[in-house]
Design a protein with these regions (language model features):
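A structural signal for multi-pass alpha-helical bundles of membrane permease subunits
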Residues: 3-292
Length: 292
C-alpha cells in the first residue's frame, strides 16, 4: 500500500486540479456548444432547436460587422506587429551599447493590461485633450486626428494600441531566435561577400520559421479574443462601428438576454481558434517526428 501511494503520489496531488480544470474549462466549453443549439434566452433552456441560433447569428448585421472588424484588425495587427518586431530585433542584434535599456523600453508595454493600454490611448487619441489638441496648441490649427470618434477609422485606433502593446513581445521572440543562430553561418556569408541585408533576408529569417509560426499563432489568438482593449478604448463605438466578436458575445449574453445567440458566437470564436492552433500543432509535431 505504501509503495503504491509513493508511486502514484504525483497523480494523486494533481488530480483535484485536473478535475477542476476538466469541469470548469472543458465542461463549460461543451455546455456552451450545447446551449448554442437551444432556444435559450435570458436563462438556459435545454430543448433542442437545431442550428436556428446559428442561422440567427449569421443573419445578424451586427455580427457581420464584428467579423469584418475582426478581419481588418487581425490582418493589420499581425502584419505590423511582426514587421516591427523583426526590425527591432535586428536593431538589437547588432550588439548596440544601449541594448539592455532599449529592450526594457520595448518590452515595458507588455507589463500593462489591455485595460490600462486602452485607457491611456483613449486619452491620447481624444480630440479634445490628446494629440489633436497638443498639435493645434502648437499653432497647427488645421490639424485633425479624430479617429477615435470616427465610424470609419475607430477600428484603426484599436490596431494602433494593440500593436504598441504587443510588438515588443514579438521583438523578444525574434531576438531570442536571432541569438540562437550559429555565428559561424553569418561569418561564412560575410566572407563570401554577402551584405548584411542579404544575410538577414536570404539566410537568417528563413531559418526562423518556428518563430514566425509561434508569433502568428499568438497574435491570432490575441486578436480573436480581443475584448478588454476594445471596451477600454472605444466600447465598440461610435455606435457599433468597432464591434468585435467578443464584444458582440458579451452584449448578447449580458445586455440583450440572448444566451443562445451569445453561445453560438462563442462557438464560432472557439472553432476559429481551433482552426488556427490545430494545424500549427500538427505541423510542429510532424517536424519534430521528422527531426527525430
Amino acid at each position: 500500500m505504501f509503495y503504491w501511494l509513493q508511486k502514484n503520489l504525483p497523480r494523486i496531488v494533481i488530480s483535484p486540479s485536473f478535475a477542476v480544470i476538466l469541469w470548469f474549462v472543458y465542461g463549460f466549453i461543451l455546455w456552451t456548444f450545447y446551449v448554442s443549439f437551444t432556444k435559450s434566452k435570458m436563462l438556459p433552456r435545454y430543448d433542442f432547436w437545431g442550428i436556428e441560433q446559428h442561422f440567427r447569428l449569421w443573419s445578424n448585421p451586427r455580427w457581420f460587422n464584428a467579423v469584418e472588424n475582426l478581419l481588418i484588425f487581425t490582418v493589420l495587427f499581425v502584419v505590423v506587429c511582426i514587421l516591427i518586431g523583426i526590425l527591432l530585433s535586428i536593431l538589437l542584434d547588432q550588439k548596440i551599447r544601449a541594448e539592455g535599456f532599449l529592450r526594457t523600453i520595448y518590452l515595458y508595454p507588455m507589463a500593462l493590461s489591455f485595460i490600462v493600454t486602452g485607457t491611456a490611448w483613449k486619452w491620447m487619441l481624444n480630440p479634445t485633450m490628446g494629440i489633436e489638441k497638443l498639435v493645434t496648441d502648437w499653432g497647427f490649427t488645421d490639424f485633425t486626428f479624430d479617429w477615435l470618434v470616427s465610424r470609419e477609422m475607430s477600428i484603426y485606433t484599436i490596431v494602433i494600441a494593440a500593436v504598441w502593446q504587443s510588438s515588443g513581445f514579438i521583438m523578444a521572440l525574434f531576438l531570442a531566435g536571432l541569438r540562437s543562430i550559429d555565428d559561424e553561418i553569418v561569418k561564412a556569408a560575410k566572407i563570401d561577400g554577402a551584405s548584411l541585408y542579404s544575410i538577414y533576408i536570404t539566410i537568417i529569417l528563413p531559418m526562423m520559421r518556428p518563430v514566425f509560426m509561434s508569433s502568428i499563432v499568438i497574435l491570432l489568438h490575441i486578436s480573436i479574443k480581443s475584448y478588454d482593449l476594445v471596451i477600454a478604448l472605444t466600447a465598440g463605438g461610435p455606435g457599433t462601428s468597432s464591434d468585435m466578436p467578443a464584444v458582440f458575445m458579451t452584449q448578447m449574453a449580458f445586455h440583450r438576454s440572448e444566451i443562445g445567440l451569445a453561445s453560438a458566437s462563442a462557438a464560432m470564436m472557439f472553432l476559429t481558434v481551433l482552426a488556427v492552433v490545430v494545424p500549427y500543432l500538427y505541423s510542429e509535431l510532424r517536424r519534430q517526428d521528422a527531426n527525430s
